[in-house]
């Protein structure tokens, strides 16, 4: 909890009141209309996976940590890291996708847009190849002194570690 001295600073009180007003406004429609729907759009440069589909929940990996998104989620904009995106449909089924990177926008109207640099369903990936690529990248990292090359190899390692984790 903030000390009282901080709350008396000019401008800070307005910020706190604004946040409370938003939270109250966001909670009011949910109570009045029952469960909200979430409109989900998920695409990569080569494929559209969902276009305005009503889904129950989406789990995403971001640079600040993985989190789940439900209807009426707090608006946010996040950068995706390599990992597993899980989409929970209204009927209880789940779809799993591996994304390399991208962004996700969660809007106040319960619409969500996930734009991935690369995205594939898990059945299109090979665990053996991912493990081999991971081992190769780890071996290359040991003998590399150039910082730019080390950074590129580290990205390959991170992506392949996420692939292996998603497939195991």
Swiss-Prot record:
GO terms for molecular function: proton-transporting ATP synthase activity, rotational mechanism; structural molecule activity. It is found in: Mitochondrion; Mitochondrion inner membrane. This is ATP synthase F(1) complex subunit delta, mitochondrial. It is linked to Mitochondrial complex V deficiency, nuclear type 5: A mitochondrial disorder characterized by childhood onset of episodic metabolic decompensation featuring lactic acidosis and hyperammonemia accompanied by ketoacidosis or hypoglycemia. Chronic manifestations include developmental delay, easy fatiguability, and 3-methylglutaconic aciduria. The transmission pattern of MC5DN5 is consistent with autosomal recessive inheritance. The modification N6-succinyllysine is found at residues 136, 165. The keyword DNA damage does not apply. One of its GO terms (cellular component) is mitochondrial inner membrane. Residues 1-22 form a transit peptide. InterPro entries: ATP_F1_dsu/esu_C_sf, ATP_synth_F1_dsu/esu, ATP_synth_F1_dsu/esu_N, ATPD_C_metazoa, ATPsynth_dsu/esu_N. Component of the ATP synthase complex composed at least of ATP5F1A/subunit alpha, ATP5F1B/subunit beta, ATP5MC1/subunit c (homooctomer), MT-ATP6/subunit a, MT-ATP8/subunit 8, ATP5ME/subunit e, ATP5MF/subunit f, ATP5MG/subunit g, ATP5MK/subunit k, ATP5MJ/subunit j, ATP5F1C/subunit gamma, ATP5F1D/subunit delta, ATP5F1E/subunit epsilon, ATP5PF/subunit F6, ATP5PB/subunit b, ATP5PD/subunit d, ATP5PO/subunit OSCP. It holds the Pfam family ATP-synt_DE_N. Changing residue 106 to G: In MC5DN5; no effect on protein abundance; decreased mitochondrial proton-transporting ATP synthase complex assembly; decreased aerobic respiration in patient cells homozygous for the mutation; partial loss of function confirmed by complementation assays. Belongs to the ATPase epsilon chain family. It comes from the Eukaryota. Gene3D superfamilies: ATP synthase delta/epsilon subunit, C-terminal domain, F0F1 ATP synthase delta/epsilon subunit, N-terminal. SUPFAM superfamilies: Epsilon subunit of F1F0-ATP synthase C-terminal domain, Epsilon subunit of F1F0-ATP synthase N-terminal domain. Keywords: Acetylation, ATP synthesis, CF(1), Disease variant, Hydrogen ion transport, Ion transport, Membrane, Mitochondrion, Mitochondrion inner membrane, Primary mitochondrial disease, Transit peptide, Transport. The lineage of its organism: Eukaryota, Metazoa, Chordata, Craniata, Vertebrata. GO terms for biological process: aerobic respiration; mitochondrial proton-transporting ATP synthase complex assembly; proton motive force-driven ATP synthesis; proton motive force-driven mitochondrial ATP synthesis; response to copper ion. Subunit delta, of the mitochondrial membrane ATP synthase complex (F(1)F(0) ATP synthase or Complex V) that produces ATP from ADP in the presence of a proton gradient across the membrane which is generated by electron transport complexes of the respiratory chain. ATP synthase complex consist of a soluble F(1) head domain - the catalytic core - and a membrane F(1) domain - the membrane proton channel. These two domains are linked by a central stalk rotating inside the F(1) region and a stationary peripheral stalk. The modification N6-acetyllysine is found at residues 136, 165.
């Amino acid at each position: 909890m903030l000390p009282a001295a901080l709350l008396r600073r000019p401008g800070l009180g307005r910020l706190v009141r604004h946040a409370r007003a938003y939270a109250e406004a966001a909670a009011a429609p949910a109570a009045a209309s029952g469960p909200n729907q979430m409109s989900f759009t998920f695409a990569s440069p080569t494929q559209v996976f969902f276009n305005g589909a009503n889904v129950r929940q989406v789990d995403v990996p971001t640079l600040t940590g993985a989190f789940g998104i439900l209807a009426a989620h707090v608006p946010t904009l996040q950068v995706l890291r390599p990992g597993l995106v899980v989409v929970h449909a209204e009927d209880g089924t789940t779809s799993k996708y591996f994304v390399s990177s991208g962004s996700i926008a969660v809007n106040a109207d319960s619409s969500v847009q996930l734009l991935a640099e690369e995205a594939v369903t898990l059945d299109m990936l090979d665990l053996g190849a991912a493990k081999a690529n991971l081992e190769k990248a780890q071996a290359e990292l040991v003998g590399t002194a150039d910082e730019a090359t080390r950074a590129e190899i580290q990205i390959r390692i991170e992506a392949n570690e996420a692939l292996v984790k998603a497939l195991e």
